[in-house]
């Protein structure tokens, strides 16, 4: 079973479908997590034989290797098959691949039952590995009619405990305050262009089931920083509807806190919301409950470079092995 944790949009899927049709190939793998808390697959993976190495401009070193021993391949296949897979990145690619497979199968009656078009290339890694890196993606709101930072803070106080942070504080100071707040519940930092900043932590004395916007979130989502930000602040205070959030009408999604704060203080945008990274366990809990998180809730790092491995999608060529 494959579990998504984000909704997909029709525009990006249409773009990817055109790429599939033009290239008849999967040029960029998905990114999925399997469960292996006892690291039982490590010994099989260790049999891999090196094929190539390269470094990308972002400073990441990549190694490509091949597992060819039959017993190792079987151990990996069986181990992954026992696990529910969580999509970390590549929701649009995955759904597009499914649609493309149906399209080709319908148009090509002679297509092999194990044709290449029926398989999706994906990078799999152990979701229980403590070395797995997830970075936060922040929210930078802009073009807000009549917005004032003071009014945001005043309205937020009905839902959040408000703690003023040092004016003009560096990004490291703000993100450190966020890290310390994690133990108290969902929290974000709101920063203004003039240097003001506040730590907002969800109050424990309010009935979330009766909250105007948070009540529409399933309880499992109300435990996450990102869902509380989107429902409690972006929609509840700033009036950015879920549809506008999906369309990115008033939002940018920066990944580096220092760079985003610098742009804000240089006059770009109205307010910056800094986030903690969403723990993998929270993402899996939401997905297993059948829900999805807001867009760009996670940023798994590093990504596999496009073109490092290519899976052709020829319906007449069968992929070796069992279906």
Q: What kind of feature is each model-predicted range?
A:
Residues 1-323:
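Surface-exposed, charge/polar-rich loops and edge strands
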């Amino acid at each position: 079973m494959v579990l998504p944790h984000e909704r997909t949009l029709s525009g990006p899927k249409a773009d990817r479908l055109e790429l599939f049709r033009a290239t008849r190939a999967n040029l960029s793998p998905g990114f999925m997590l399997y469960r292996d808390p006892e690291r039982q697959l490590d010994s099989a993976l260790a049999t891999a034989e090196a094929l190539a190495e390269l470094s990308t401009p972002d400073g990441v070193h990549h190694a490509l290797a091949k597992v060819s021993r039959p017993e190792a391949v079987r151990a990996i296949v069986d181990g992954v098959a026992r696990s529910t897979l969580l999509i970390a990145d590549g929701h649009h690619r995955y759904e597009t691949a499914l649609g493309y497979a149906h399209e080709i199968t319908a148009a090509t009656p002679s297509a092999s039952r194990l044709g290449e078009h029926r398989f999706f290339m994906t990078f799999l890694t152990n979701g229980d590995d403590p070395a797995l890196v997830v970075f936060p993606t922040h929210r930078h709101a802009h073009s807000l009619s009549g917005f004032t930072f003071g009014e945001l803070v005043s309205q937020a106080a009905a839902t959040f405990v408000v703690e003023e942070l040092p004016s003009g504080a560096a990004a490291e100071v703000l993100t450190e305050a966020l890290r310390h707040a994690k133990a108290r519940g969902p929290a974000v930092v709101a920063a203004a262009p003039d240097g003001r900043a506040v730590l907002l932590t969800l109050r424990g004395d309010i009935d979330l089931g009766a909250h105007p916007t948070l009540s529409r979130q399933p309880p499992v989502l109300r435990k996450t920083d990102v869902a509380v930000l989107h429902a409690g602040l972006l929609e509840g205070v700033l009036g950015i509807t879920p549809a506008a959030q999906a369309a990115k009408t008033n939002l940018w999604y920066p990944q580096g806190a220092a760079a985003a704060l610098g742009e804000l203080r240089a006059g770009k945008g109205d307010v910056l919301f800094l986030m903690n990274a969403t723990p993998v366990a929270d993402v899996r809990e939401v997905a297993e409950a059948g829900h999805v998180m807001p867009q760009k809730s996670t940023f798994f790092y590093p990504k596999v470079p496009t073109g490092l491995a290519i899976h052709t999608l020829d319906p007449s060529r069968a992929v070796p092995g069992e279906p």
